[in-house]
Amino acid sequence: MSIDSQALAATSQASRGMSTVYEAVAEALLNIPSSTVIADLDRIASAMGDDRFASVEASPDLEQRFYNRFFVSSSAFHIAWSESSVWNSSVVEGHIEYASPVPSRKAHAIACYEKAGFDYRKLTGYEIAVSTLSPDAFASELAFMSYLHDGAARAAVAGDPSSAQANLHLAKQVLEQHLSRWASRLAEMATVAGDDFYARIAAFAADVVALDLQQLRETEAR
């Protein structure tokens, strides 16, 4: 992948946009579904021609669904939101079949973070969500993608094509080795419990991951 001076402005704009998208999705996973959180995500999705969040409204029921999806393991709506748990799991005849966790997925995610200077423990949000957050959680990995794209955008603005390239190359590697290999499966698992805000978030994120990977591959091939 080569980024010359004429391409820096385009790189900055594209990466800034992707950083914003990933950030909005991660924040929706880490916070109580307030009207602001929902509106932010809907605005981002709408800008991409996606209206799947247009009908979602904040409510006590939706807030309870947030708890059930992430923290109440006995709930029928609860699923695992970490790569190590989803990696070998599957949906069979409408039921989720969990396999044993794969610790190496978590370890590799941490190695990627350390390479880029990203600390998932500094993510902010609802107290329980951030205090129980694992390094290979969906929100952690999406936030990392936001971080990498932001780094690429900042480097492009600063006129540093080498740093921009390094951030985008690592972003592509993370997508290829991590998110692209489990985001769609997570979305399928989330849908088992029905079409709710969180199933739509998972599906939207999987679409974003696929789009981003396609664009990064095209950029690298130039």
Mark where each language-model region is.
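Surface/interface-facing alpha-helical segments and adjacent flexible terminal/loop regions used
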Residues: 1-222
